Amino acid sequence: MANLYETANRWMTERKIGFIDLMLPFYISAACCHIINLENKKREFYFEHGQPADMRLHMFITAPPGYMKSFVLKRFLDRQNSLFGQTAIKTAFMGQVTEAGFVGTIQSVDGESVQQPGMAYDFMDHILGIEEFSALTNTMTSDHSKNLDNALLTALDSGYLIKRLAAGELRYETHLTLWAGSQPARFNLSSGLGRRFGFIYFVPTAKQQLQMRQFRREGKGIMGSKATADSVYHLTEKFTSDAQKIKEISFADSIYTGLDAMEVPHYEEPLYEKIALGYNLATQPITPSFTVRLSDAIKRIWQLENEWRFKIKSGALESQVMQFIIESPGIEENVLKTKLIDFGMSFAETSALIDTLYKQRRIGIINDSKDKHARKRYLWPMS
């Protein structure tokens, strides 16, 4: 019998949804972590440093405008025809959400303070997809954490949310798992908030752009197999039931050997542990004493996450420009700028990034020596 991951893969393939090899492992892992976290909050069987561990894996996808951010989240979470839409996993999908809308607030009604908890309360046991969460994005793109709302941070960390306002105190517990996204930006992953998300960085190569065009066309008129949808339903029901049997969770030495080999910073290890935990839960039989082990598949998933986090740490926008130059060595500057318009970047933004990359010695620039009046510049990646 196929496991949950294999069945979800088949569900996506039947519906002609592209690049599932890149994205599906992370979202399935996060979904399994969500279920096991709810169970751990009920029975408290897995502890870290004397506290019941929070096992949620929040996800954040960064991609240019029009390149699958909303599409991916909707196919997992939105309405009954999504992957998890009719399963034991509670899901919701929202468009634009403010910080107050997520955390909540207190308002004065007829002279009395009335609590108005936000989505973190309303969907406390859901996986919530948010198309545009400006407060979250603004916090992670800030050079410092001074603008960080502590209530937002704790909602995604321990789940114990306390927000003190002039009208009173807002206090509740949430176990919501958040999946969000934005356009490429300079994210500060060393901040408390950035460390709590697994990142997917998707700036399609020229080949992938052609594949996207093909996937879009192939998906016309495709409903997908009801039998596969039923299998996803039954497997999530079984997983939720089997999770109730778990009495302890341990991590094999191979997990830490793998993390040491990748030189993962200690403050990012919990993220990689959760990826491995979720993937093991989705692919292995559930036992009362469940051991998380390293596999070739997990090594590949970890490597993807490591590469994406490096690109984001070093500048997601710079990485986007570099990708085009690496694909087309010697590309003329104005040709590059024109291409990047379709990726949400203005001529001025691209010019500034080219100058930055040149100063960092990541690219070389050759001026057109044949026509001095043309002022053409050709860009090359530095080895």
Regions found by a protein language model. Name each.
Residues 314-383:
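Terminal-proximal interaction/regulatory segments of ATP-powered molecular machines
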Residues 72-99, 310-342:
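Long, charge-rich low-complexity segments
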Residues 1-7, 48-49, 244-255:
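Active-site-adjacent bridging/hinge elements
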Residues 21-38, 274-281, 359:
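Short, hydrophobic/amphipathic alpha-helical patches that form generic packing surfaces
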